[in-house]
Amino acid sequence: MGSLGKVNNEIPTKSSGGSKVLVIGGTGYLGKRLVKASLDSGHDTYVMHRPEIGVDIEKVQLLLSFKMQGAHLVSASFDDQRSLVDAVKLVDVVICAISGVHIRSHQILLQLKLVEAIKEAGNVKRFVPSEFGTDPARMENAMEPGRITFDDKMVVRRAIEEAGIPFTYVSANCFAGYFLGGLCQPGYILPSRDHVTLLGDGDKKGVYVDEDDTAAYTLRAIDDPRTLNKTIYVKPPKNVLSQREVVGIWEKYIGKELQKTILSEQDFLATMREQNYAEQVGLTHYYHVCYEGCLSNFEVDDEQEASKLYPDVHYTTVEEYLKRYV
């Protein structure tokens, strides 16, 4: 197919609010939500796309829908450093949402090229790299092979900080779509009405965040001096729950108790080792959350927690989220 155009120079339909924002990875699972949140916030919003998209009609239609809502489409590529520099020169804030999930694609280190482009451009006031999960700085003892996710994110962090680029890191813990839909069971995204496997005793607390809320909080943070060069945590108090508590909410909705099987730590690890590499990476993350409680073994100050920083943002509770599956 032909190009969508290097830049849509038409005036966005929404009034500009604050910084000009470039979203990279804007057609992805979280990226499309970041674009929507940016537009909804009134930001002059730019969405980067590859010069040629082939015949990926869904991606093209999504990009065109962004354009119709007032976004600028910017043609650039990680294989063309000059195009990256030109793209970031258009904006004040860069938000990157390229995939770091191995079952999709793991592209975290591509951001090193983006860091170089931002450094060369010299105009970016805030960079939000692709993180949005567990804080990698707290995972230095993570298990193989899943630790590669955290290690690579730390490589990018060091490059950002060594380059002197202003940043905000967003730790949004567990995506609700992946965790709540399957009642915290790996490999499931719809809740059963009959049976659930509890990981260990099912009592380790996780933190479950609606992806739209992650996007909304991120867009609030980009112009906030309180979040400059800091990590913010999306840890809404009503969403800090154990697997048993999540299951209990679901049981209340469907009016019955699920049959429960306990999966011991040893059996989980044995099963994990039988999977392919990409699956093992994801299962390692489940292990740290559900067996070790890595999301609830530390306290977060109010000035670093998103729902405290922005109390006017209504976040979706676990109860509200699960209701859609009834």
From Swiss-Prot:
CDD domains hit by this protein? PCBER_SDR_a
User: A GO term (biological process) for this protein?
Assistant: (-)-lariciresinol biosynthetic process
Q: What is this protein called?
A: Bifunctional pinoresinol-lariciresinol reductase
Q: How does it assemble?
A: Dimer.
Q: Record's InterPro entries? A: NAD(P)-bd_dom_sf (IPR036291), NmrA-like (IPR008030), NmrA-type/Isoflavone_red_sf (IPR050608), PCBER-like (IPR045312)
Pfam families linked: NmrA
Biological role: Reductase involved in lignan biosynthesis. Catalyzes the enantioselective conversion of (+)-pinoresinol into (+)-lariciresinol and of (+)-lariciresinol into (-)-secoisolariciresinol. Abstracts the 4R-hydride from the NADPH cofactor during catalysis.
Task: Quote the record's binding site residues for substrate.
Answer: 285
Where are the active-site residues found?
153 (proton acceptor)
Q: Which gene encodes it?
A: PLR1
Family (UniProt): Belongs to the NmrA-type oxidoreductase family. Isoflavone reductase subfamily.
EC number(s)? 1.23.1.2, 1.23.1.1
Give the residues the record marks as binding NADP(+): 25-31, 50, 59, 157
GO terms for MF:
lariciresinol reductase activity; pinoresinol reductase activity
User: What triggers its expression?
Assistant: Up-regulated by continuous blue light and fungal elicitor treatment. Not regulated by salicylic acid.
Q: What class of enzyme is it?
A: oxidoreductase
- Keywords, ordered alphabetically: NADP, Oxidoreductase
Catalysis: reaction(s):
(+)-lariciresinol + NADP(+) = (+)-pinoresinol + NADPH + H(+); (-)-secoisolariciresinol + NADP(+) = (+)-lariciresinol + NADPH + H(+)
Outcome recorded upon mutating residue 318 to M: No effect on enantiospecificity
